[in-house]
Amino acid sequence: MMNNQSMVRYQDGSYDFGSSPSPPVYSPIYRSPPPPPQPMYGTLPQYPRFLDNSHHQVMDNSDHEQQQQHHHHQQQQQQQQHHHQQQQQQQHHQQQQQQHHQQQQQHHHQQQQQQQQQLDKSYAPSNIVSELQRKIQFLEEEISRKRDTIEGLQSQVAKYEQEKQSEKKKQSRYWTPEEHSRFIEALSKYGHKDVKSISQYVSTRNPTQVRTHAQKYFLRIDRERGRKLESKESINGGADKDDDWLREEYNDEGSPTQYSSCSNSPTTNSVANPFSNSLIISSNNNNNSNSSNNNNNNNNNNNNNNNNNNININGSSGSNSNVNSGNSSPLIKRKREAVTITATQAKSALLYKDAVLAILPTSWTPSDYEQFSKGLISNIDQDDIHSLCKLIKENFLPMQSMENIESAYHAFQKAVLKQKDINNNNNNNNNNNNINNNNNNNINNNNSNNNNNNNNTNNNNNNNNNNNNTNNNNNNNNNNNNNSSNINNNNMNNSINNNNINNNGPNSPNLLSSQPQQINQQIIQQQLLNNNNNQNSNQNNNNNNNNNNNNIINNNNNNNNNSSNNNSNNNNNINNNNNSNNNNNGNNNSNNNNNNNNNNNNNNNNINNNNNNNNGNNINNNNNNNNNSSNQIIQQQQQVQQQQMQQQQMMMQNQIIPTLPMPSPQSQVLQSQFQPQQQMQQQMQMQYQQQQQQQQQQQQQQQQQQQQQQQQQQQQQQQQQQQQQQQQQQQQIYQQNLNSNSGNSSPNISSINGDFVRSPNYNNKKRPPPVNVSRPEFPVTPLSGSPSHSPAQSPHYNLNNGNNNNGNGSSNSSSYSGNQSPLGLVPSPSLSLHPPSPLITSPTSHSIRWPGPLNNTLMYDYRRMEPSHGINYVPLQQSPHAPPQQSPHFNNNSNNNNNNSNNNSNNSNNNSSGSSGINISDLNNSSDENNNSSNNSSNGSGSWHQYQATDSPTGWGMNQTITAFSNTSLSINNSQS
């Protein structure tokens, strides 16, 4: 029996594709029924349902749903009833199955026929065509719907592209007229500083674009205004076209246009222009006339006065305009005045707020001025003042009158021009100040140099007293007196020269006139008095100058010598401390002398400069006199000078003051005029001679000093030679000791193994300093008890001082003190089997420097016991028992006292030799070591004694080594404690 629910049927009628989806029970997507039987026309394809914006959802009508539900409900009821009947028949007729089997088959066959009939009806060709038509219609509608969406998207893309292009056009650097008009409106509304508000008002430009547009706009206005003014001035003509606006006459006194710059304005009442150059030039001329008579410092004050005058003039003119601002005559026809202020000046209108409000009437408030500044910058493109003020009144200041606004404009213009004039005057004043300050600084520097002369001489006195040089003290005292006298003389000479210049000016026709003669006589008398009083002082100064110059030359040589002496003294300090101290004292004296000479040099330079200045003044006087005098007077002057020169030469030769010939009346006048010059020449000659004498004396003194220094150098060289000889002698003794010990020591290492032979120059190389046991970093611990057997004398420590005792090896050498580590001192006769290996790091494989006489030799020269790879020691040739006789390498207890005394002697010797840097412990220890030699001689033969073999650490040799090492101050236990 086939299930009727497995089939999905479509009712006849119109199919609604736009309704809500049907429940999922009736959709083949959400159900999986069993496969239906094959109909007669084959299976129908399951077409997907294309719905608008609801993917795979079934659309259905409410009426159609009710019909389908009713039809399916009837089928379900029929099927349920039929099944129920079949079950009842099967239950009641089980026993009668065979009888009713045919009836059931017939009934079943009838049902199949009914079903086939129903299928034939449902799947008729007409139904299939209608279904296909519906689907085609649905697909066409779907296609049209998709086309509409595509067209909508394309239109949106086109709009987006158009908007992009329009935005690009908006962002272009070229502003449209509408944008510019909005910009002007925003500028008048918000001002030029509120860029954000302007950009929002324009609505197509960002703030940066607004800012750049405003800058270009204002700059264009300034350029156009400048061109207009230039063209206007060129039309008016005249050479002074830049100053035309300053020379123009104004209107009536009360009108606000009295400050106008219009050239065609009528002149009702001529008022002086406060900005004209005539007033400024006249004031400058007056001040300059004053400054010519005064010093350089007065120029600065005069320039400042100019500025003050300008300010007062401007202020007075502004106050008059304020008082009479209301008396303007409206009947006068005047031409519209051009706007002369620039946009940059209008933008800075708030800077002139206080200056303008001070001129304007009291009815103006700061807020009114702010509105005025906004209107000024927003309407700066206006060409004439009347239209500018009219726009300001209409848009910004409706409560103020046109006259007040025009007066505010002129006040602002006046403040701008006043600031410009102040800036120009400041620039000029700065230039003048720089020149005047330079002159004053030069004068002050010269005065400071003179003051330094006095200070330097006082310092020289102190230094010379420390050195106890009487000659230098006398010279310095003279320098003090002479410096003071020079200053006075220079001042007097300068005053005299100034008087001569004024009197001998171009106004005086002749030198023989009455007034110049009287003045010259007074001047000559003053000069005679001053020169007579100060001749000696000037001579002393010149002499001192010459002496100091010689000192400069000689002291340079002395400095070189001192530098060489210092180097030699440093070398001597290493060897002899006493000699180096003496040399240092000498060097200190020389250094003090050099300091004094340097101070004298400063004085010489300054004094010479003063003398040159005086000479220059005299030359200037001569030039003035020559310009004012005739040729005859010049010739007479030359004759008089020649006579005076001859007389001075005679005085110098004979040292007798001759009588002067009586001059003529004309020559008397000339002599009275030029007598100061003659006296100056005489003083110069006397000073020159004295300078030469002092130079000779100083040269002699310097030669003596050089000789003394040479003697000191020779003494130092002799001391160095003596020290070198002593060092050579000590080295010879040391080498002799080494050579004498080489015969008694162990076999040469070089004969056993040639690879370890050192170069002959090995001893000459620089080595680290010896380890001094007496130093505080190596504390010597006292022995608690009697030390163990230690090698009192060993052939390895054999350093004879040229004395061999029968060749037994028991020579006078330094004993083993107990403070030395004996690890490497146990000899091994089988050295050929165990050569010294410097590459192995063992306690004795590196170079160790021992105190005492062994400080110049390395431990490579001695036999040593080296550990090989474990605790295996060098095998010796005897049994581990005690030796049959005592070894010469170890002393008895009786020798320990000698060892302690040797330690003390070594310490004392090291301390004493620390000053010279040379250890001479060989000589000092020789006397202490005689006891050791006697003890060693009693031990038997001095030849090598063969030890017993120490194959284990418990051997006798190892025990002796350990006990000896434990008693030393360099042991591990003592170092840790």
UniProtKB/Swiss-Prot annotation:
Keywords: DNA-binding, Nucleus, Transcription, Transcription regulation. Gene3D superfamilies: Homeodomain-like. Residues 1-122, 229-331, 422-516, 531-650, 738-853, 872-960 are annotated as: Disordered. The keyword Chaperone does not apply. GO terms for cellular component: nucleus. It is found in: Nucleus. It comes from the Eukaryota. Residues 52-68 have a biased composition (Basic and acidic residues). Residues 75-118, 276-329, 422-504, 738-754, 798-848, 887-943 have a biased composition (Low complexity). Its main location: nucleus. One of its GO terms (molecular function) is DNA binding. Residues 195-218 bind DNA. Residues 167-222 form the HTH myb-type domain. Residues 241-252 have a biased composition (Acidic residues). Residues 254-275, 505-516, 783-797, 944-960 have a biased composition (Polar residues). It holds the Pfam family Myb_DNA-binding. Residues 21-39 have a biased composition (Pro residues). This is Myb-like protein I. The gene is mybI.
